[in-house]
Amino acid sequence: MAFEENFLSAQVLYQLSWNGKLEHPHIIDVEYASDQGGLRLRDVKERLTRLRGHGINDSFSWSYKRTYSKTFIWNDLSDDDVIHPLCGSGEYVLRASELIDTNERKSCDVHSRHSNKSMQSSPTMLLDNVTSKQDTIIGDVHFGALESGENRRIGDKLNCLVRNSGANLEEVKSLRGVSAVISQSLPTLYADQEIMDVEKSDFCLSSSDTEISPRPKMTVDSIKPVKDVNLVVMTKSSTVHGVHTPPSPSLKSSTELPFSPGGTKRLWEKEIRKSLFRTRNSSNVNSVSTEDFTAVHMELPPNTHSTHEDNSFWRDSRSKSPSPSSLNELKEVQIDKEEVEQSTSQLIRLLWARWTGGSSKGKRIPYNTCEGASTKIPESKHNSPYRTKSPYKEIRSTHVEGSHQETRQSLAVQSKARVSLEIKEILPPEECMHYPSPMTVQNVTEVASPHAQTDGGGDVCTIKTIVSEQASQPYPEPRDLRTDQGILSEKTPGLHIAVLEGLTSDAPSGPAEAEVDTPLPAVARAKTGNTLSKLKTIASSKPLPPGFHKGTNDTKPVQITPRRTPRNSIPLASPPLVRSFSRDAVRGFSSLAAISLCPDKDSVACTPSPEKTIVKKRINYSAREEMPLVPGLTTLDWEKALQEATTDCLPPPNFSDILQECSICRRTFKPDSLQVHMRGCHPPQYARAFSARASPHVVRC
């Protein structure tokens, strides 16, 4: 018992921090002598050594938690220092941090630096080791394949020479007979290696552009230097040439392949793709040689000179080997150009004969002029703009098409200029001003008659051209159509135009604006000589107005009153607006203005409905807030007083000052509720006289 009285026990909470991590806290019971003045670090370490081993004492530095100026700090400890408990709780809290040995860290750094320097200073030694290992493996594989005993002995000797870097060159030269045996014993290696080389190669076009040759890619084995002198000699000598696979030679032709059929299929697919690319991007004249091209170039007309100059880039960038198919195509192109590039007068005669001949091939498209016939007719057939009846085949190219179009456009411009000159010679400009718009030309049907083709053919063409060119209005007015009929009848006496009744309006009443913007009907009749009248329906590209109904003969315009919207109520060219502000509408903060639109009398009449001025009643909040709080005024003031008392943290107001008492029943009410109560409040005698129930304020006996 006396021994136990000399020692005390305390619970210690400790936490280890090692390897950058913090362990969960642990708690232990530590005994210490009572005469030493308190718990010391030595006592804690002895207890931890018994529990967790001897290494924990020298591996950590210890500190305990204490209070310092109202905060907690960690106080470092040595073995003889006393650990003080926390103020208030009386707990012992320790923390152990892992020690860092600077000597070991320096030794590790020196070792790593030395290893890095050695790696950087001797890269050639590593390469030598790698190459020697690979060569020894190759030598073992190749020479191990020899079947006879004598060859096997020679192979072993050669392997030894390869391993030894100081071998003599004379001993290597004495083994010249080995190459034949090695080449015979390893026939499959060459085929496999060639297949790999061709599959790795990049196929490209040669300079002649007629064959595709594989271009071997550079690999690591071909770039790697060989440091061993013996291996260099072995590679260069003809005796040991079978050890290393020779580079695959370039193929003589794209069809002769010395390897598997699978590679042949892939190579043919690439060749087909490249040939298609050449034929797609090159012109028909590109494959002609220079001699044939100069001979043909002298025979071609001068108009085609620009076309061949544009093709010079494509001709020079491709091969110059001629082929019979390209020569035939060149002849066809030359024939086509000779037929296309005829004189302008002959081209106009061909177009005129086709136009008036009655055939469906040369019919003009609706509302086209004589000038536009050369450009509008080919669009329906998707052919060349100068296509004639000759049965030759057209050949197109994607890259040369632009130059052909320029030549054809220049011819079309020349033809237009000549036709316009003939028109100016026939009619003076004064008479051209009275002709209608191109919409009237839609209603004239071309009827094939002998009189029109022989005598009045030129006049009809001239009239149609002038009518289409000299029109000044997009839609002619119906009252001007009779003058157009007179002009047409004067120029062509055999032509009679019968216009339907819906075109003109004989009624004098009604404003002139009702006839504006009414397009012509889509049906007209044309009579020429004694021939029967033909009816032709033309679909106009512009939409019909609301008054016209599709599929009916009723072509009279129906006046529909348009619905007024903010957009259509104001015309496009609106007159200046007149703004009038009403001062009566201004009330307080709101400044409202009534704007009335007053257009001129010439424009469409628009009378907008008068709008009522909006008058807003202004509430003077500032004056209301400044009013004093009078008890018994309103319920709002009573609630406001309660709210202000709550927000200002003031004592609640005296309700006896706010509430009012009824003089009859002596009950208290809010000011506004009291007035309602007084309407139905009666004395007790009155209540007993008219009701079986007495007033609640009267006590029954």
Swiss-Prot record:
It is a peripheral membrane protein. One of its GO terms (biological process) is plant organ morphogenesis. GO terms for molecular function: protein homodimerization activity; zinc ion binding. Residues 238-262, 300-329, 366-389, 538-575 are annotated as: Disordered. Its main location: membrane. InterPro entries: SOK, SOK_DIX, Znf_C2HC_C3H. Keywords: Cell cycle, Cell division, Cell membrane, Developmental protein, Membrane, Metal-binding, Zinc, Zinc-finger. Pfam families: SOK (PF06136), zf-C2HC_2 (PF13913). GO terms for cellular component: plasma membrane. It comes from the Eukaryota. Residues 8-101 are annotated as: DIX-like oligomerization domain. Belongs to the SOSEKI family. The DIX-like oligomerization domain is required for polymerization, edge localization and biological activity. 'Soseki' means cornerstone in Japanese. Homodimer. Forms long polymer filaments with other SOKs proteins polymers crucial for polar localization and biological activity. This is Protein SOSEKI 1. It comes from Physcomitrium patens. The lineage of its organism: Eukaryota, Viridiplantae, Streptophyta, Embryophyta, Bryophyta.
